[in-house]
Amino acid sequence: MSSESNPETQIKLFGRWSYDDLRIENAALKNVISLKPVYLPHTGGRHEHKKFGKLEIPIVERLVNRLMGQAMNSGSRKDHVNSKNQGKKLKAMRTVKYAFEIIELRTGKNPIQVFLDAIENSIIREEVTRIMYGGVSYFHAVDTSPSRMVDLAIRHIAQGAAMKAFRSPRSLAEALAEEIIAAAEYDRNRSFAIRRKEEIERIALSSR
């Protein structure tokens, strides 16, 4: 009997959450988000030396990898330098697992789908780049590529969780769950990722 017809043999994230019926509404993101069913979000760096290989990494693993490099501070630019979680992937996976359990309890939905909704709401469609003309630099608005959209969304979700957990009684898993739920609901008052998205797009709009 195939795995598709037997629910007991289906591959589920951490043995709990199914990959069935997951949806991505934004057509631009469908080719840059991998929803390949995996039990554990760990591919062992098999795509490291392949161009655009990260697009084949399961989307939950990309969140796990980002948490390893996220410093537990105010989200400074030196996150990778200040992070104390470099290489601690098991710790990061446990954090994501506990966060997903909290999301399921609070929303009653598949936490993978809630995470996908958070990414779609947090993507930055337009940003600014610096252009040099005759020794003078100008800021110019540019469209963001789909791959970078996802990268920035995951980065800001991880930063928002770290900022909520920094010097706070709540754990990183609780902060991550709160940030994902707030981003999925497009709550700019509670989500750092949503506020950051709106700030960058506002700057890009003024630089057109």
From Swiss-Prot:
Keywords: Ribonucleoprotein, Ribosomal protein, RNA-binding, rRNA-binding
Claim: RNA-binding is one of the keywords in the record: yes
PANTHER family: RIBOSOMAL PROTEIN S7
Native organism taxonomy: Archaea, Thermoproteota, Candidatus Korarchaeia, Candidatus Korarchaeales, Candidatus Korarchaeaceae
GO cellular component terms given for this protein: cytosolic small ribosomal subunit; ribosome
Gene label: rps7
UniProt-listed CDD domains: uS7_Eukaryote
Family per record: Belongs to the universal ribosomal protein uS7 family.
GO biological process assignments: ribosomal small subunit assembly; translation
GO molecular function, one term: rRNA binding
Job of this protein: One of the primary rRNA binding proteins, it binds directly to 16S rRNA where it nucleates assembly of the head domain of the 30S subunit. Is located at the subunit interface close to the decoding center.
SUPFAM superfamilies: Ribosomal protein S7
Subunit structure, interactors included: Part of the 30S ribosomal subunit.
Name assigned to this protein: Small ribosomal subunit protein uS7
Superkingdom classification of source: Archaea
Classification via Pfam families: Ribosomal_S7 (PF00177)
